[in-house]
Amino acid sequence: MRCHLKKWVVVAAGLSILTSLYVYMQRAQSGNLKGSVIWTWDRESWMEGIKSHYLHFNISINVLGGVLQPSKKYLTVGLSSVRREKGFYLHDTLQSIFSESSEEELDQMVVVVLLADFDLPWIQQTADKISREFAVQLSKGRLLVIHANKEHYPPLTGLKRNFNDAPDRVSFRSKQNVDYSFLLHFSSNLSQYYIMLEDDVGCSRNFLSSIQQHIRSMTDSKWVTLEFSKLGYIGKLYQSKDLPTLARFLYNFYQEMPCDFLLSHFRRLLMQDKVIRFRPSLFQHMGTYSSFRGTYNRLKDEDFVQELADNPPADVRTNIQVFQTYVPEKAYSQDVEYFWGVSPIGTESFFLVVFREAVRISRVQIHTGSDGKDELASADVELGRVLVTGEPAVDCSGFKTLGSLQHGQFNEEGVQKLLPDAVVCLRIRVTAAQPEWVIISRIQVWTVKEDKTI
């Protein structure tokens, strides 16, 4: 009982602190800093008797490149970049954002890059490089490059060593929290939504359209954070109305814990208990060396797909017994849920996707199991060319085998070369009985894109 009471007191105190944060933002032109935006954060001390030189301050954000637009966009893509001991990935990240988006998508977004290093020559050099290589995007207001002077940062040394981290790691992650705090505040009035990236990521093709689709699917739900990657704080989406509060939250608790920990606490404090993550991931970490100490880092998101699957409209069914609400449709829906089937699973078992219109297929990818468990051990993947109408459901015939699952996985590209004709269904046919249950987490289908050139 005492433990539960203690937890409740902590949560209540956290909520009290959070709800007492008040943000006032004012934009003004600085007479000393050309092209800058002054953001004034006024607040009363949220704890009686606590005084600090950084509880009340003005920060000057210098806009180094780009044109602020008079109207709001749909999405702001925000990323912070610092000088690395090894590697430089910012150019590739920006190139990926712009090249993987259509002109229509680019008109709906703005990319904000905070050059957050204290090395001013590096800042100038990097800003000049961006100006040369992305001149068109800067001129169209699709890209903004900003910087905050060191004088606006709170103390970054002599901080609390929570988690027993080394002092330099504490300083690094604490500064990173402040970097994102400044970036969030600057971006809070630029668009309807905001997504957080790092400066060493690659993007899926047409990622904005996919984000819009998922946001529409959440119309009837209240949410704080939507996630489009499983790595750290890459791909976390927020509503811009929450950005000032989130920015203040990161700033107030900048030395307590890493940014991804704080973001999780923020989500829970605003009463979203469960993580809402969509799959496949839209963003992939591509850096080889970390911005901290230049250490080797090959972290990858295995759920990332460069070109998102089409998954044309279809009806899905199986003769495998369904466990609770883990219905067959969830394997084909491209969200975080999955199909879960109960044993026994025998050679008569199948999983069938019947397309509502005949389609030409270029690629099929299937993932089964979770953490090495509940994999479909032995099955063939087949495409059917003839629709058979009957009772109790529509079926198919004229099957051609694409291949077999290997360790519960299947990935076949260039399907149109093996089967150039349109097909009406995809079947996973079990070829050996297994006592284990089965999870089919993802079925992805890419269709042949017709060449519209003459």
Curated annotation (Swiss-Prot):
InterPro entries, sorted: Glyco_transf_54, MGAT4_A/B/C_C
EC number per UniProt: 2.4.1.145
Reactions catalysed: N(4)-{beta-D-GlcNAc-(1->2)-alpha-D-Man-(1->3)-[beta-D-GlcNAc-(1->2)-alpha-D-Man-(1->6)]-beta-D-Man-(1->4)-beta-D-GlcNAc-(1->4)-beta-D-GlcNAc}-L-asparaginyl-[protein] + UDP-N-acetyl-alpha-D-glucosamine = N(4)-{beta-D-GlcNAc-(1->2)-[beta-D-GlcNAc-(1->4)]-alpha-D-Man-(1->3)-[beta-D-GlcNAc-(1->2)-alpha-D-Man-(1->6)]-beta-D-Man-(1->4)-beta-D-GlcNAc-(1->4)-beta-D-GlcNAc}-L-asparaginyl-[protein] + UDP + H(+)
UniProt cofactor(s): a divalent metal cation
Glycosyltransferase keyword on record: yes
BP terms from Gene Ontology: protein N-linked glycosylation
GO (cellular component) term, any one: Golgi membrane
Glycosylation sites: N58, N189
Residues in compartment: Cytoplasmic: 1-6
Major location (coarse): Golgi
Spans within the Lumenal topological domain: 25-454
Membrane topology label: Single-pass type II membrane protein
Subcellular location: Golgi apparatus membrane
Pfam families to which the protein is assigned, alphabetical: MGAT4_cons, MGAT4A_C
Keyword annotations of the record: Glycoprotein, Glycosyltransferase, Golgi apparatus, Membrane, Metal-binding, Signal-anchor, Transferase, Transmembrane, Transmembrane helix
Entries under PANTHER family matching the protein: ALPHA-1,3-MANNOSYL-GLYCOPROTEIN 4-BETA-N-ACETYLGLUCOSAMINYLTRANSFERASE-LIKE PROTEIN MGAT4E (PTHR12062:SF11), N-ACETYLGLUCOSAMINYLTRANSFERASE VI (PTHR12062)
Function: Glycosyltransferase that participates in the transfer of N-acetylglucosamine (GlcNAc) to the core mannose residues of N-linked glycans. Catalyzes the formation of the GlcNAcbeta1-4 branch on the GlcNAcbeta1-2Manalpha1-3 arm of the core structure of N-linked glycans.
Family, as annotated: Belongs to the glycosyltransferase 54 family.
Protein's name in the database: Alpha-1,3-mannosyl-glycoprotein 4-beta-N-acetylglucosaminyltransferase C
Organism of derivation: Danio rerio (Zebrafish)
